[in-house]
A protein has these predicted regions:
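Short, well-formed alpha-helical segments that are part of the catalytic scaffolds
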Residues: 6-20
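Acidic helix N-cap motif at the loop->helix transition within catalytic regions
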Residues: 9-13, 36-45, 84
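A conserved acidic beta->alpha catalytic loop
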Residues: 31-39, 79
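Glycine-rich, basic loop-to-helix element that forms the pyrophosphate-binding segment
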Residues: 51-67
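Short aromatic/hydrophobic "clamp" motif used to bind/position activated sugar donors
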Residues: 72
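Conserved donor NDP-sugar-binding/catalytic core segment of glycosyltransferases
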Residues: 83-111
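A recurrent flexible, glycine/aromatic-enriched loop bordering the glycosyltransferase active site
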Residues: 97-107, 116-137, 141
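Hydrophobic helical membrane-anchoring modules
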Residues: 158-216
Length: 216
């Protein structure tokens, strides 16, 4: 499942990388009403395209409901799966109900990548740009994504981890550092870590979303 809003510049590459990395995947793009041709760009790759205005959580639940497979993978439109992803996912799901990938950026940032991957490895805290995946049974058992306006990915990962375990696979996705480029590296890191800290301190996601509107 790939949720999108105005991602015409990246969605085709994401779909192509998924097709190359996974054995015969069912690719579903769930679009929130893009005005830049995202839906057409996705359809041109052969992906199924659904329309689902609303939050990213709602989009991913819509995609999961439409999917026919036993394994669900949630992929950001600016994130590329690595070669060998299919085998890595199968190995992870033989051990646990869910998993995620390590992270790498399209413009390498070694210190940040090491910090994020250490956090994921030690605490099993993962986010949507790490291509979270789960067996359908595990996803359904925890009730899918909760209707949160922000931090929906961390919330789902935590519930999956508690329910049936979550494995960090030894491969890295490549995700765009475009926000670092547009907003500045230091500012982006500070903003992200502040949101994570406030969420950990149980500040309601609705309040966080009002203060820090999420990218769709």
């Amino acid at each position: 499942m790939i949720p999108t809003l105005d991602e015409a510049a990246t969605v085709a590459d994401s779909v192509r990388a998924a097709r190359a990395a996974l054995p015969d995947p069912e690719v579903i793009v769930v679009d929130a009403g893009s005005g830049d041709g995202t839906a057409a760009a996705a359809a041109a790759t052969g992906a199924s395209v659904l329309s689902a205005p609303g939050t990213r959580a709602e989009a991913m639940n819509r995609g999961a409901a439409a999917a026919t497979g036993d394994v669900l993978l949630f992929l950001h439109a600016d994130t590329l799966l690595p070669a060998g992803a299919g085998a890595a996912i199968a190995a992870a799901l033989a051990r646990a109900g869910a998993g995620a990938f390590r992270i790498g950026f399209d413009r390498p940032r070694p210190l940040l990548e090491r910090a994020i991957n250490a956090r994921s490895r030690i605490f099993r805290i993962v986010y949507g740009d790490q291509a979270l995946f789960a067996s359908r049974r595990a996803f359904d058992r925890v009730g899918g994504y909760r209707p949160l306006p922000i931090m929906e990915d961390r919330d789902l990962a935590a519930r999956l981890r508690r329910s049936g375990g979550l494995v960090l696979v030894p491969l890295a996705v490549t995700t765009s550092a475009r926000r670092h480029r547009s907003d500045g590296h230091a500012r982006t890191i500070a903003r992200n870590w502040l949101i994570q800290l406030l969420y950990t301190l149980r500040v309601p996601p609705e309040r966080l979303a009002r203060r820090y509107p999420p990218a769709r």
